[in-house]
Amino acid sequence: FIFINIFFYRISEHGTDRSAQILIFLLIIELLILINLDSHFRENSTKFFILLILIISLKSFYILYLILLFPILYYFIKDKKIIYVRDFLKNPLFYLSFLTFIFILLVNFFNSGCLIYPVKITCFENFSWTIPLQEVSQMNNWYEQWSKGGAGPNFRVDNPEIYIQKFNWVGNWITVYFFNKVSDFLYGIIFLSFILFVIFYSKNNKVEVPYKGIILIYLMLILLFTEWFYNHPALRYGGYPLIALLLFLPIAQYLSKKNYLNFNTNIRAY
């Protein structure tokens, strides 16, 4: 909540980019709840899938977040909770979410001839309305060039096809983008994390209740971060929640082991 109000305070910048990224934070919270709580499974699973579909509907490339289904399947099998799958399949909202997902793909298909535009391998070139594959590739390369710091309102790099390949772009990206936007964002979340750490830190450990899924979810986030950094390293294309969550989750896991009795007592006293 604090993060959203500090870093996403300008409503004019929200659009579909910021809104989807706010929902990603909620999605991770609901994922942890779904994995760790046996009660209210139907309600928790409903919230998770509604959030997931909403995120994908706002930006099609967030279809990559379907990878977060893996921790659910893993722990259902590991903890022998397959019985929950039956309850899940009886939930009409599951089928509504699935149909919504199919509808999103169809809308993309009828608009561009691609299931996910501008990803060339998802395009069907045999239909009359399909955008020519060369134009799809050019648009994809343009988005990649822009996100890698190779283009802006007043400049373009030479040889963009070579620039976006492998890690040729990293040096220039650090100069024109990292130290303008990413570094400020990192300073902000590190400072916010420090403030919250100081407020909630306690030397008294409490009886630890292990939270399942933290490590596996963290690995999924690292995979998503790697894909983000290699293909479209702009904060507006999913960087905000990935960077923040990679920092917040370990801190939250550490602070969850502490006893907040003294902190709560002081708050009540004031």
Please report, for each region that a protein language model flagged, where it lies by residue.
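Membrane-lumen/periplasm interface segments of specific transmembrane helices
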Residues: 91-183
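Perimembrane helix-loop-helix junctions
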Residues: 65-98, 254-256
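Juxtamembrane "helix-exit" motif on the non-cytosolic side of transmembrane helices
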Residues: 4-12, 78-79, 111, 201-205, ...
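Membrane-interface anchor segments at the N-terminal boundary of transmembrane helices
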Residues: 9-12, 159-217
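Membrane-interface alpha helices of multi-pass inner-membrane proteins
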Residues: 8, 44-60, 64-71, 99-102, ...
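Multi-pass, polyprenyl lipid-linked donor-dependent membrane glycosyltransferases
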Residues: 1, 6-33, 238-240
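Transmembrane alpha-helix segments characteristic
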Residues: 1-4, 27, 47-51, 98-99, ...
